[in-house]
Swiss-Prot record:
Family to which the UniProt record says this protein belongs: Belongs to the UPF0711 family.
Protein name as annotated: UPF0711 protein C18orf21 homolog
A Pfam family of this chain: DUF4674
Keywords assigned: Phosphoprotein
Residue numbers of Phosphothreonine PTMs: T140
Start-end of Polar residues biased regions: 147-156, 173-183
Source organism of the structure: Rattus norvegicus (Rat)
Region forming the signal peptide: none
Keyword Phosphoprotein: yes
Positions of modified residues (Phosphoserine): S126
Region of interest: Disordered: 130-192
Positions with biased composition (Low complexity): 130-146, 161-172
Amino acid sequence: MRQKYYIEAAARGLVGSCPGQARYLLWAYSSTHEDNSTFQETCPHCFQLLVLDNSRVRLKPKAKLTPKIQKLLNREARNYTLSFKETKLLRKYRDSASVLLITCRTCNRTVRHHGKSRSFLSALRSSRAASAASKASPKTPKRAAAGSTNISQSVHGSKGRSPSSTVRTPTSGQSTPICSSRNGSKRKKHFSQLKALLSQSASDKNPTLDFRHFLSSL
C-alpha cells in the first residue's frame, strides 16, 4: 500500500513536467498487480490522471418514482397479485442506481461508476433499524425482571411479616406456650378474686379475700 501511494504521489508530481512518465508509472504498477489495485481518479484505459482539464464528469440519476410505479407499490403492499410485466417494472425500479460517467479527453473513453441500488439501501436501512432494536431490547427485560423481583420480594416480605405465616420458636429468654397458659390462668384467677372483693360489701368476714392479700399474691 505504501508503494502504491508513493507511485501515485510521484505521478501527480510529474503530471505538469513529464506527463508520459507519470502515465508510465501508473501503468507499470497496475500491470504488475491485481485489478483491485487500480488508482482512483485515473483512466483505466490510458492511465491518465483525471483532472478538470482533461476529463468530463456527468451524473446519470436513478429512475424516478412515477405515478404508475407508485400505484404498483400500493398494490403490492395490499398483497395484490401482479403480472409478470408489472413485477419486472418494479424490479427495475428497485435495482436502479445512480451512475457517475467520467469521460477521458485523452483517449475519449468513458468510465462508469455505479452507485447503490434502492433495494440495497432499503435493506441496509432495515438492518440498521433491526440492529438498533436488538441493542435496545436486552435492557427492557432486565428492567422488567428487576421490577418483578422487587414486587416478589415485597410480596414475600409482606407475607413473611404476617403473624399467621411466621413460626415463632421459643428462645432462652422467652416463655413456652405452657408458661403462657399458666399466666393466663393466673390472670383469670386474680380477676375473679378482684371481682369477688368488689362484689362483697363486707370483706372482714372472709380474711382470705382481703385486698392486701390480693395485692401480695400478685
